[in-house]
């Protein structure tokens, strides 16, 4: 199966800071990771968007 591109958006400001590749098979939940947001200048929760 092919990989699809997705981005990780900051939960606080909504800025899309990171891009990742995910499998194309459907999954019930989306990825949530604590990463550094350049806009907020702190570590925040980032959620997967497509």
Curated annotation (Swiss-Prot):
Keyword Ribosomal protein: yes
UniProt record, GO biological process: translation
Source organism superkingdom: Bacteria
UniProt feature coiled coil, ranges: none
Protein name according to UniProt: Large ribosomal subunit protein bL33A
GO (cellular component) term, any one: ribosome
Name of the gene encoding the protein in the UniProt record: rpmG1
Source organism: Streptococcus thermophilus (strain ATCC BAA-250 / LMG 18311)
Keyword Ribonucleoprotein set for record: yes
Protein family according to the UniProt entry: Belongs to the bacterial ribosomal protein bL33 family.
Single GO MF descriptor: structural constituent of ribosome
InterPro entries listed in its UniProt record: Ribosomal_bL33, Ribosomal_bL33_sf, Ribosomal_zn-bd
Keywords: Ribonucleoprotein, Ribosomal protein
